[in-house]
């Protein structure tokens, strides 16, 4: 039935099996029959139609006898296009979400971000709504736009909803990457056709491409326009070339980050008539003359190079030597290697070797900005040692304001059991600490001693030792596992621990790691044993022996053999030897677990060779006793298998700052609470613990070893499990309880 009311035509949704006569009538008088109409059911697209599904204007009502209730309830249009719920978009892109809906009018569509109603100006750049709120647009998305977006459509008959999830991926700030396969020098004859190809391998932002020719002047041959495609711009074809076409051709590609280019030469030869070709045999004597002339020129050039090298060497002052003494007179290695290498940003050259004498000599040029005099440093007792390094407490005499002052310091140096690699690691640590600079929550470098003696690194001194021992030392009495030998008294406890203190320690370490990430430095060995506790409960990140500079790339791939903290490493670091800021975030999650377990050992009972399978199965460390559910969720976020889904240190600082502000300074750890966690020590060792200690003793390591030797391809040379007690019940008498900064290979 078709009716005309208020100048609008209403078409009742009726199915006719055959043609029928349709009449029109006005509000005042009937009209004549005008046509024969075969009606069919048709649902219009609500994104383009200004009328509802029954053909009525929004202000009119529908006859209930012509539409069933199920057509009145809101329902989605093209629901198959809404199946993709997770959208990963690069930062800076425009994102659109659509919820096309139909049903009885009026229908209201509301949008929510993580459960909160979306306001039009609720983000930088605002939200844009189109098609009666059925489409939302986010221009130039940023990291804070990561969320779940839900559209809710409802009318008086019911409501439906649909949720999209947006993941914003940070862009890689590099210019376009070009392939030079198609840009090779070519030599052709006049009249030939030449093709140069310039393939863009990668460009985060859309690149702009131009083709240039360099001869006497630069000529723009081809430029991308509005209607050109990428395939057209990647190819330059020259037909019927002439001598004027010879020269250098360049493909220039640029984006908002920078410009890249590849070039090739075109040489054009004349067409030679075969009838004009003639050859003249070169006399045999001429061959001999050319050969002799070449040999003489080579000898003269070689003599000139030797003369210039000798002249430059004689004009330079001889480098000073640093003897690395061997006080224990351990026999040197029988094989001598003398590689020549350039170290870091130092303007110096060094020759590394293991000679047949009892010392190693390194040629190094002093850095006047950091060089200290040995007579200004007074060494005291040894406060920590490992396999290849040791740390002494010292007094540093410095001049400030015209008068001398004494500063507490820690001096790190190598032991007699060192190797060339240990020396290189110590030099790398020195170079990293110089480059990183100063921050409240990292151990700052005070200076170095590279001349007239063994190599010293002079750093700040933390009076309360490392964080792991501090937490264990201040556990409630019934959980205390004393850090002492049977003949020595237990170390004194500092002060009762509060949950706010644990939260403050976590927040400070996150701030220090945020600073290192801004400096493009990955730590690779973040753990409670490498965080020092200074006065006023100030946390300082230490041990840059494994730290690496990633200013040129956003990652570091380990290619050599060496020891790594296996149970603190991210999954991709274990399997692919790939280290990024995201792997440091994983290690920070383990550090949080250590803090709120009061110095517990991670993955108790899990063998290192089973750890990868354990993590790939989705298993993670259990919630520690003193961590809240919110904090444990933060740990689990740090242990996401995909590095892109882990939070950044900036976000971790914000979250921990909020948690710290809401925590109470009077909330002490419950001294009477029972604790039966697997990560705390037990009076009776399991068989697994015994095997771990036996293995450790056989290799010269204690049972609390955390490093695994890894080769360049991720294979394990051997295994040391950490399922044993927190500390060796009979530690070396030279190791005191307030352990300080450790070397890379120390345990």
Curated annotation (Swiss-Prot):
InterPro entries: FGF_rcpt_fam (IPR016248), Ig-like_dom (IPR007110), Ig-like_dom_sf (IPR036179), Ig-like_fold (IPR013783), Ig_I-set (IPR013098), Ig_sub (IPR003599), Ig_sub2 (IPR003598), Kinase-like_dom_sf (IPR011009). It is found in: Membrane. Gene3D superfamilies: Immunoglobulins, Phosphorylase Kinase, domain 1, Transferase(Phosphotransferase) domain 1. The keyword Endoplasmic reticulum does not apply. The chain crosses the membrane at residues 289-309. The keyword Transmembrane helix applies. The modification Phosphotyrosine is found at residue 556. The active site is at 525 (proton acceptor). Its main location: membrane. Glycans are attached at residues 26, 42, 63, 161, 185, 217, 227, 240. Residues 74-167, 175-267 form the Ig-like C2-type domain. Residues 1-24 form the signal peptide. One of its GO terms (cellular component) is plasma membrane. GO terms for molecular function: ATP binding; fibroblast growth factor binding; fibroblast growth factor receptor activity. Its EC number is 2.7.10.1. Belongs to the protein kinase superfamily. Tyr protein kinase family. Fibroblast growth factor receptor subfamily. This is Fibroblast growth factor receptor. It comes from Ciona intestinalis (Transparent sea squirt).
């Amino acid at each position: 039935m078709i009716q005309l009311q208020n100048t609008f035509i209403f078409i009742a949704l009726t199915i006719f099996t055959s043609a029928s006569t349709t009449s029109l009538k006005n509000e005042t008088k009937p009209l004549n029959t005008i046509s024969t109409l075969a009606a069919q059911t048709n649902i219009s697209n609500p994104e383009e139609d200004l009328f509802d599904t029954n053909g009525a204007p929004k202000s009119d009502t529908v006859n209930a006898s012509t539409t069933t209730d199920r057509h009145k309830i809101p329902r989605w249009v093209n629901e198959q296009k809404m199946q993709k719920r997770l959208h990963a978009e690069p930062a800076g892109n425009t994102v659109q979400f659509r919820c096309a809906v139909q049903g009885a009018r009026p229908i209201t569509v509301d949008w929510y971000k993580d459960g909160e109603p979306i306001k039009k100006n609720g983000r930088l750049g605002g939200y844009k709504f189109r098609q009666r709120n059925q489409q939302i647009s986010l221009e130039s998305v940023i990291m804070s736009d990561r969320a779940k977006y839900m559209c809710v459509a409802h009318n008086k008959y019911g409501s439906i909803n649909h949720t999209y999830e947006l993941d914003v991926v940070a862009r890689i700030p590099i210019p376009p990457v070009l392939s030079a396969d198609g840009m090779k020098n070519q030599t052709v004859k006049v009249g030939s056709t030449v093709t140069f190809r310039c393939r863009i391998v990668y460009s985060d932002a859309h690149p702009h491409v131009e083709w240039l020719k360099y001869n006497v002047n630069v000529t723009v041959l081809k430029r991308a326009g509005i209607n050109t495609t990428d395939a057209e711009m990647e190819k330059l074809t020259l037909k019927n070339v002439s001598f004027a076409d010879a020269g250098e051709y360049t493909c220039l590609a640029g984006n908002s980050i920078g410009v890249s280019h590849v070039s090739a030469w075109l040489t054009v030869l004349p067409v030679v008539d075969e009838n004009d070709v003639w050859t003249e045999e070169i006399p045999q004597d001429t061959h001999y003359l050319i050969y002799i002339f070449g040999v003489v020129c080579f000898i003269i050039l070689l003599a000139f190079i030797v003369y210039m090298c000798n002249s430059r060497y004689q004009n330079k002052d001889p480098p000073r030597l640093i003897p690395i003494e061997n006080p224990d007179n351990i026999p040197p290695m029988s094989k001598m290697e003398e590689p020549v290498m350039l170290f870091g940003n130092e303007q110096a050259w060094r020759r590394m070797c293991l000679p047949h004498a009892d010392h190693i000599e390194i040629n190094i040029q002093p850095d006047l900005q950091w060089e200290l005099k040995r007579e200004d440093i007074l060494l005291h007792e040894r406060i920590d040692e490992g396999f290849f390094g040791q740390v002494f407490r010292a007094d540093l005499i410095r001049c400030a304001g015209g008068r001398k002052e004494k500063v507490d310091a820690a001096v790190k140096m190598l032991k007699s059991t060192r190797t060339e690699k240990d020396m290189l690691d110590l030099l790398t640590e020195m170079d990293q600490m110089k480059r990183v600079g100063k921050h409240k929550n990292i151990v700052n470098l005070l200076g170095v001693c590279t001349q007239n003696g063994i190599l010293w690194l002079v750093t700040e001194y933390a009076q309360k030792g490392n964080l792991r021992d501090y937490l264990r030392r201040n556990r409630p009495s019934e959980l205390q596992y004393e850090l002492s030998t049977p003949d020595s008294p237990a170390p004194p406890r500092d002060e009762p621990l509060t949950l706010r203190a644990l939260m403050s320690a976590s927040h400070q370490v996150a701030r220090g790691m945020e600073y290192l990430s801004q400096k493009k430095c990955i730590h690779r060995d973040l753990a409670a044993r490498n965080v020092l506790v200074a006065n006023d409960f100030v946390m300082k990140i230490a041990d840059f022996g494994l730290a690496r500079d990633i200013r040129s790339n956003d990652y570091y791939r380990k290619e050599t053999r060496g020891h790594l903290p296996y149970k603190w490493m991210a999954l991709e670091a274990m399997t692919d030897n790939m280290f990024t800021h995201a792997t440091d975030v994983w290690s920070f999650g383990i550090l949080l677990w250590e803090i709120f377990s009061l110095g517990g050992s991670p993955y108790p009972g899990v063998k290192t060779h089973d750890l990868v399978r354990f993590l790939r199965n989705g298993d993670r460390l259990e919630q520690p006793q003193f961590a809240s559910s919110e904090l444990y969720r933060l740990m689990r976020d740090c242990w996401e298998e995909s590095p892109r889904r882990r939070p950044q240190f900036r976000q971790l600082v914000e979250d921990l700052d909020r948690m710290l502000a809401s925590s109470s300074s009077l909330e002490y750890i419950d001294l009477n609470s029972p604790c039966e966690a697997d990560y705390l020590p037990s009076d009776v060792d399991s068989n697994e613990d015994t095997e771990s200690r036996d293995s450790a003793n056989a290799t010269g390591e204690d049972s609390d070893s955390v490093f695994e030797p890894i080769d360049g391809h991720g294979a394990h040379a051997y295994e040391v499990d950490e399922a044993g007690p927190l500390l060796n019940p009979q530690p070396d008498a030279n190791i005191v309880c307030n352990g300080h900064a450790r070397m890379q290979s120390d345990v």
